[in-house]
């Protein structure tokens, strides 16, 4: 496992068109030369959706698209942020007075999350100012983790300016925790793969303690990303945080049903650990203990033996106070079955049978069905795109990322890649002008990329 510090690499900026362009724009904007550059990649989750925050392992890989920041420390305490994309306005604040507005998921707030995470980790009251120019080529709100990549990039920028050191694991944990400043209750997958990724391999990411294991993907097949072009801004919607709460409530009701100390339980994985049984057995417990009809707040209170006031003040998060019903059975069933699929996927990759691509594809298809029917995080466009991808030769296709929009990931035999891309282009993008305009960043094959690092000009 890569537990060491993020790498620092010396580069000839003139030989890298994107770095050179960023350097020139930085100079034009701030009247000085960047001291260093930091990049942090986006990711595609191959399998294991909505289970990291329930305590279960996931199987992502870094994509080649990333966030890239040019940085120039300054002698004042002013933090100045600019973006190469004019859609994202400049922002300036005092480095020692960072305020993050949860109600406004504006681009600079994700930078501030990473900055503040490092500040709080070291207990610093005085921070140096800096000029930063951000350049991202991860499609925003696409489920490829552009926002978390920006948080990670900002964390590594801040650490580098301070001249301090942390391991990749520590950085991932700090950035996962600090993204919650903006109201996103994620589980840590996005930040972990952004730091722990290595070129040429996917990773099984496990939590508590955080660790990453190489997973060699089968030769003869490629992963293709296709963007539905339906944007989903994770922090601006209640869907995601309601699912987090439904999983937490399901864990508590299951724990109470099995006579465990339910009030200490937060995650579905904890119930399985406490009972010491397999995922398959947990699915049977779920069938036995939970019903398919939505639970009202009153019924949850009755199950747990608590008052409505206790439910509101001790369990429900601020952004789920208005919810009247919760689907516990469906969410628990998705989580336990998806966690099992992740382990099966890894086992197939390790055993590498002749029909590995077929087996992995079927696991991806099962995952999408569960996301659509049990977790209800798909949307009509994603379902249509998945169907198109399967129709034109993908062995497996599923939504990736939070869902409710964003991207699909498909497993495609390498020898059919060209015809697959042409067919999907024609069926999903060609007849729709807004999709067609974004297609360059919406349909592409990808291979596992490397993790976050610092560039110094040679």
From Swiss-Prot:
Active site: 190
Molecular function GO terms recorded: ATP binding; galactokinase activity; N-acetylgalactosamine kinase activity
Keywords on record: ATP-binding, Kinase, Nucleotide-binding, Transferase
SUPFAM superfamilies, sorted: GHMP Kinase, C-terminal domain (SSF55060), Ribosomal protein S5 domain 2-like (SSF54211)
Enzyme Commission code(s) on record: 2.7.1.157
Cellular component, GO annotation: cytosol
Site feature (Transition state stabilizer) residues: 43
Role, per record: Acts on GalNAc. Also acts as a galactokinase when galactose is present at high concentrations.
Binding site for alpha-D-galactose: 43, 49-50, 52, 190
Name of the gene encoding the protein in the UniProt record: Galk2
Residues reported in the UniProt entry to bind ATP: 143, 145-146, 233-234
Protein name per its UniProtKB record: N-acetylgalactosamine kinase
Entry keyword ATP-binding: yes
Entry's family note: Belongs to the GHMP kinase family. GalK subfamily.
UniProt-listed PANTHER family: GALACTOKINASE-RELATED, MEVALONATE KINASE/GALACTOKINASE
Gene Ontology biological process: galactose metabolic process
